[in-house]
Structure formats: C-alpha cells, structure tokens
C-alpha cells in the first residue's frame, strides 16, 4: 500500500469516527423526552397502557397508593421550601428554611445529562406517560404512568425540555445514574416529595403553578459519577 493510500484510509477512518461521535452526541442530547406545556394536562392513570419498555426490557406500571404525609409537614407553607439535588452523591434533600425534612437516594442522568442550576417546579402530574431515548443506541424507553411527576424549568431550561423529578418502577438501582436526564426516585419517596412540594395539588391529578400557588425551588448541583 502506497503512502498516499495510507493517508487516504486514515482520513476516511478519522471522518467515520468523528461522524459516529457526532451522531452519538446528537442522540444523547435528545434522549430526554420533550413535553408540550400547553397541551398535556392529564394526570390520570391510563389503564389502557400499562406495559412499557426500558433498556430493551418489558416493564409494567401499577396504580400507586395514596401518600399520607407525616404530621410535621402538614400545613407548612411553600415560601421557605426548597429541594436540593446533589448529583455527585446522588441524593435529594428537602428543606423548610434551614431544617432538612427529607433526604433520599436518587438516580440522575446517565444516557442524558441532568441540568444544573436553580429551577422551579412548574407542574405536577400524578401519572405521566414518558418515552424517548434512541433505539439505535439501545437507550429507548417507553414508560406509561410514571408516578408523582414534578416538572421543573428556568429561563435557560424551558418547560418544553421535559426535565422532572418522579417515581420509578422500572429499576431499583438508586444511588447510581440511571436516567435520561430526569431525577428518578423510589416511588413512595417521590410521593412524599410530591405531596410536600408546591404547587399544592390536593386531590387534583394535574396542577400547574400560579402566582397564588407557586412551585417549589429546585437547586441541582455537582457532577454525576460516570458509571
């Protein structure tokens, strides 16, 4: 093989490598499912769709039991509440002022990055169908009736991006990144945060923030482990 041919083959190999990396990054960048904030307003359990798929494995959703809040948080106001998510240690903490009310393990983004910054919950769904990822990269997911979903946003990360905190029935690997960008929690623990955080939802299956019923602040920081 001549020197010219070797150079040509090297350039072709380099081009293919760059193209593959770009394709992978593009697929990962869109792995988090988007949402239409003005169209999707149902938080009801969909009994016609109970079987989904996560990472090539069939998964089945179940209706969740009603969460009973501990007495010490009943009647508390939203003004001094905040949620902190530590990506480095894969933990979520809920505060009222300086008092820590809850601390739970979570799973943040693995196939898609969880954004960092200060956000506000803008809507809550008792149940929410979610799908996204990439079949080519084998990260596709189709998850019906995701429980206790709390979507958050800020000026840089709009509501349509679909980032949220929610319960999880398709894995039990908390403490390790396992999501496409959202914050995965054990379902019963997500239920406690859901009932505690604003906007106050009461018996409503879907609630959106208003001036009179604001969403709780969510602060996300750190760097998730690479696993």
Where are these regions (language model features)?
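Gly/Pro-biased beta-strand-loop elements
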Residues: 56-173, 227
């Amino acid at each position: 093989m001549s020197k010219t041919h070797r150079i040509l083959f090297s350039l072709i190999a380099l081009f293919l490598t760059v193209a593959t990396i770009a394709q992978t990054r593009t697929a990962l960048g869109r792995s988090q499912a988007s949402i239409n904030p003005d169209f999707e307003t149902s938080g009801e359990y969909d009994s016609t769709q109970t079987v989904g798929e996560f990472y090539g494995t069939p998964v089945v959703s179940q209706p969740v039991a009603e969460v009973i809040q501990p007495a010490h948080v009943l009647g508390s106001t939203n003004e001094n509440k905040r949620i902190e998510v530590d990506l480095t240690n894969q933990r979520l903490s809920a505060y009222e002022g300086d008092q820590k009310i809850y601390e739970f393990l979570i799973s943040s983004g693995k196939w898609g990055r969880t954004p960092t910054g200060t956000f506000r919950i803008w809507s809550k769904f008792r149940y929410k169908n979610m799908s996204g990822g990439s079949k080519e990269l084998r990260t596709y997911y189709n998850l019906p009736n995701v429980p206790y979903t709390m979507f958050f946003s800020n000026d840089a990360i709009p509501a349509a991006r679909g980032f949220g905190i929610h319960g999880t029935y398709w894995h039990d690997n908390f403490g390790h990144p396992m999501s496409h960008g959202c914050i995965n929690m054990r379902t019963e623990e997500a239920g406690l945060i859901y009932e505690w955080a604003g906007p106050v939802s009461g018996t409503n299956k879907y609630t959106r923030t208003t001036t009179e019923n604001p969403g709780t602040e969510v602060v996300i920081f750190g760097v998730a482990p690479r696993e």
